[in-house]
Amino acid sequence: MNIFDELKARGLVFQTTDEAALSKALTEDMVSYYVGYDPTADSLHLGNLVLILTMKRLQMAGHKPYALVGGATGLIGDPSFKDSERSLQTKDTVTKWSGKIRSQLERFLDFENGENKAEMTNNYNWFENLTFIDFLRDVGKHFTVNYMISKDSVKSRMESGISYTEFAYQIMQGYDFYELNQLHNVTLQLGGSDQWGNMTAGTELLRRKANKQGHVITIPLITDSTGKKFGKSEGNAIWLDADKTSPYEMYQFWLNVDDADAVKMLKIFTFLSLEEIAEIEEQFEAARHERLAQKVLAREVVSLVHGKAAYEQAVKTSEILFGGGDLRQLDAKSILTGLKAAPQHQVTDDEDLTLVELLISAGIAPSKRQAREDITNGAIYINGERVQALDYVITDSDKIENRLTVIRRGKKKNFVLTY
């Protein structure tokens, strides 16, 4: 199976230009290709990861990747299918975010070895000294207004209004393709399905200005079985930066993927072969309650993004938090991350309460009678250890890093005491 057929088998091809010619090129030649990343945040996220891994698949097949950071286009903002104008970022912010994108991409792409080693460039390099007059004469003249407003990404904004700044974005992205072709013989662009209009502006400019054929592959919007955009947890993006989304949070995200989506996501987000995935699917369907596909997803993706050690720590954290282990084996940060949704109670320095009084003060038990019953019945745990003494008082040894204590009532209800 050639790389193009594999991408299709994994559900990673939505639209292409001239599929036969593209498949032939990917089979016979080393193709130079690129993906653009506008620095619109200080970290890439799970949606970006689909494209990053697709870049890696092509590199592993012998093709040469170029990661284009949108130092110039990031100052403008892509209007594609957005309801309103993006906020413009300062040049300093865009420069700072561009640097972070590179460091994240280096985890996945090989920038060091071989003829097809990855390279990174920034479109600010060619836009910085391009005058407005030159841009209109050398680039703008190749695009008719009719062509530009026919793009679905622009049509969706015609009623609400679109500034000339954002309207011109597709020409800027098209010019990126032209420049990369002239500088590095790049002939293929990858992007999300919402980028089709901007990307084909590039193939059009390449045809008109250089009489060359360029290719485009768009990757489908990744959705779950209900049709919702995949890659968010409770409305929040899953970031690749561990300071924004911890390895533990990413691990839990993958563990909680719906059964209907798990095998699909294995094809998209892992480098397991399709044969291996078929075997996992067979075992998974035979015993869905064991959640094998989700466990493999969590292992593969967290290890890929954050490393094996971070994955193993996430497993350990999960087992201790939800398996009844000794929480003192974990650091305070891991506990607070894992129990983010648990109620918290600030204990003041002058509180020296018995466990019964503390359960009431923290809202864990509604009354002294209920608190005593919970303790004597063995339903109260401090940092994972059962406590049945009614006169028990929290001591420094119960304070993890002198910052917190976890009280569990029953099997699952956790409360965090902070100091």
UniProtKB/Swiss-Prot annotation:
<dbReference type="Pfam" id="PF22421">
    <property type="entry name" value="SYY_C-terminal"/>
</dbReference>
<comment type="similarity">
    <text>Belongs to the class-I aminoacyl-tRNA synthetase family. TyrS type 1 subfamily.</text>
</comment>
<dbReference type="GO" id="GO:0005524">
    <property type="term" value="F:ATP binding"/>
</dbReference>
<keyword id="KW-0648">Protein biosynthesis</keyword>
<feature type="binding site">
    <location>
        <position position="169"/>
    </location>
    <ligand>
        <name>L-tyrosine</name>
    </ligand>
</feature>
<feature type="binding site">
    <location>
        <position position="34"/>
    </location>
    <ligand>
        <name>L-tyrosine</name>
    </ligand>
</feature>
<keyword id="KW-0436">Ligase</keyword>
<protein>
    <recommendedName>
        <fullName>Tyrosine--tRNA ligase</fullName>
        <ecNumber>6.1.1.1</ecNumber>
    </recommendedName>
</protein>
<feature type="binding site">
    <location>
        <position position="232"/>
    </location>
    <ligand>
        <name>ATP</name>
    </ligand>
</feature>
<dbReference type="InterPro" id="IPR036986">
    <property type="entry name" value="S4_RNA-bd_sf"/>
</dbReference>
<dbReference type="GO" id="GO:0006437">
    <property type="term" value="P:tyrosyl-tRNA aminoacylation"/>
</dbReference>
<dbReference type="GO" id="GO:0004831">
    <property type="term" value="F:tyrosine-tRNA ligase activity"/>
</dbReference>
<keyword id="KW-0030">Aminoacyl-tRNA synthetase</keyword>
<comment type="subunit">
    <text>Homodimer.</text>
</comment>
<dbReference type="InterPro" id="IPR024088">
    <property type="entry name" value="Tyr-tRNA-ligase_bac-type"/>
</dbReference>
<feature type="short sequence motif" description="'HIGH' region">
    <location>
        <begin position="39"/>
        <end position="48"/>
    </location>
</feature>
<keyword id="KW-0694">RNA-binding</keyword>
<keyword id="KW-0547">Nucleotide-binding</keyword>
<feature type="short sequence motif" description="'KMSKS' region">
    <location>
        <begin position="229"/>
        <end position="233"/>
    </location>
</feature>
<keyword id="KW-0067">ATP-binding</keyword>
<comment type="function">
    <text>Catalyzes the attachment of tyrosine to tRNA(Tyr) in a two-step reaction: tyrosine is first activated by ATP to form Tyr-AMP and then transferred to the acceptor end of tRNA(Tyr).</text>
</comment>
<dbReference type="InterPro" id="IPR024107">
    <property type="entry name" value="Tyr-tRNA-ligase_bac_1"/>
</dbReference>
<dbReference type="InterPro" id="IPR002307">
    <property type="entry name" value="Tyr-tRNA-ligase"/>
</dbReference>
<feature type="binding site">
    <location>
        <position position="173"/>
    </location>
    <ligand>
        <name>L-tyrosine</name>
    </ligand>
</feature>
<dbReference type="InterPro" id="IPR054608">
    <property type="entry name" value="SYY-like_C"/>
</dbReference>
<dbReference type="GO" id="GO:0003723">
    <property type="term" value="F:RNA binding"/>
</dbReference>
<feature type="domain" description="S4 RNA-binding">
    <location>
        <begin position="353"/>
        <end position="419"/>
    </location>
</feature>
<dbReference type="GO" id="GO:0005829">
    <property type="term" value="C:cytosol"/>
</dbReference>
<dbReference type="InterPro" id="IPR002305">
    <property type="entry name" value="aa-tRNA-synth_Ic"/>
</dbReference>
<dbReference type="Pfam" id="PF00579">
    <property type="entry name" value="tRNA-synt_1b"/>
</dbReference>
<dbReference type="InterPro" id="IPR001412">
    <property type="entry name" value="aa-tRNA-synth_I_CS"/>
</dbReference>
<dbReference type="InterPro" id="IPR014729">
    <property type="entry name" value="Rossmann-like_a/b/a_fold"/>
</dbReference>
<keyword id="KW-0963">Cytoplasm</keyword>
<dbReference type="InterPro" id="IPR002942">
    <property type="entry name" value="S4_RNA-bd"/>
</dbReference>
